Amino acid sequence: MLKDITLGQFFPGDSVVHRMDPRMKLILTIVYIVGVFMVGNLPGYAVALGFLYLVVRVSGLPFGYLVRGIKPLRFIILFTFVLNLLFFPGETPLLTLGFVTLTREALEKAIFFALRLVFLVMGTSVLTLTTSPMQLTDGLERLMSPLRRFRFPAHELAMMMTIALRFIPLLLEETDKIQKAQMARGADFESGNLLMRAKAMVPLLVPLFVSAFRRANDLAMAMEARCYRGGDHRTRLRELKYTRLDALGAAAMACFLLVIFAEGRLLG
């Protein structure tokens, strides 16, 4: 299950999406997520899925690989679904179980929230899979650069966010190694109910934290050895600049938003 995590990983390639400016990809990802959260019906989510599928095909990413990235988050998605189903108020009852009444409005809201989480993860995964860590850092820094007038540490924050994002697959890989090592010594992580399996994961925490701090210390020493001093007077190997590909991406996103808006007006 851990190997299915796609968030934070980079998939090298030379597609149109890979060659786009990281600033534009960040902006378009945010706009896409906001657009998805504005959708209020199933046809709108079908449009969002179709648009995402086209982007994935253009970027050369395996769509099945992206879908598998949802698997490790199925418990969070299921928990969100059940929470909204049980506690969201509604007026059209569908089923009564004791003192709990399930309504049509609650069912719709639960489905919509679950779909939003799925599109949030998949959209963010497309961004990280098509953008290298260095490009992501430069893009975040350039987008936040106007805040430097207020003494905001744009470069440092961008670096922290990128390192944290890139640490996700590393920590998951380390967890998988530790789990396999303990299973070779007789540990059982697969039998029993969900609570028992959760308790069996507790012995993984200590070696995982030790490994995480060791990696963080190694990274800090490597940056110190290279005389890293933050973003002041920092040069770049490749300067960022917008191209026709970015204009094409912005136009495609505008078309997506127009379709979402028109569909909402027609069915709303």
What kind of region is each of these model predictions?
Residues K25-L26, G64-R74, G249:
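Alpha-helical transmembrane segments and their helix-start/interface "positive-inside/aromatic belt" motifs
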Residues F51-L61, I76-F79:
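Alpha-helical transmembrane segments and their membrane-interface exit regions
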Residues N41, Y45, G60-G64, F88-T96, ...:
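Transmembrane helix-loop junctions in multipass membrane proteins, especially transporters and channels
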Residues D14, F37, G60-Y65, L97, ...:
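Membrane-helix interfacial "entry" motifs
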Residues L73-A187, L194:
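Juxtamembrane/interface alpha-helical elements of multi-pass membrane proteins
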Residues M1-L42, A48-R57, R142-F152, E156-M159, ...:
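Transmembrane alpha-helix interface motif
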